[in-house]
Amino acid sequence: MLLPASKTNLAASDERRRNKVTDFVQRILKSGVKFAAGSDMCWFYPGKTRGEATATMFPHLRDAGMPPLDILRAVTTNAAEMLGWQDRIGSVEPGKFADLIAVAGDPITDITELERVRFVMKGGQVIRNDIEQKHSK
């Protein structure tokens, strides 16, 4: 349980982190360097999984000036290329390993759609399928 003073400190800390992210992203965009992102760059979000925390980061990147398509590239193809694994991961192609999610809307139009995951496939196994449940009713 967090005491009220702790909640205030977390909010102030989150604001400082958001400001750092904004400054960092704006410098990246200005420099033109390729950017990769992943769950290891997310700050602490109480009660959220790494995936949820990563999706929570996307609006901050957008608000700092990064277009949604570039955000999606940062966590897929760019990350794979920077790891030197583009032949194995980073895009959906035959022979590549891919964990997949599905959302109802278009994340290029509204990046927060990635916070509303409806389907998850990890390692070839369906982990979550809210789409099938909705259609079977």
Where are these regions (language model features)?
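Substrate-recognition/specificity elements adjacent to catalytic centers across diverse enzyme folds
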Residues: 14
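C-terminal cap/linker of serine protease catalytic domains
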Residues: 1, 46, 132-133
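Generic beta-structure capping elements
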Residues: 1-2, 40, 123
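His/Asp/Glu-enriched, well-ordered alpha-helical/loop segment
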Residues: 9, 19-104
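C-terminal cap of metal-dependent C-N hydrolases
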Residues: 81, 94-136
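Metal-coordinating catalytic core of metallo-dependent amide/deamination hydrolases
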Residues: 1-11
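Extracytoplasmic/secreted cell-surface and envelope-processing proteins
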Residues: 5, 45-48, 111-112
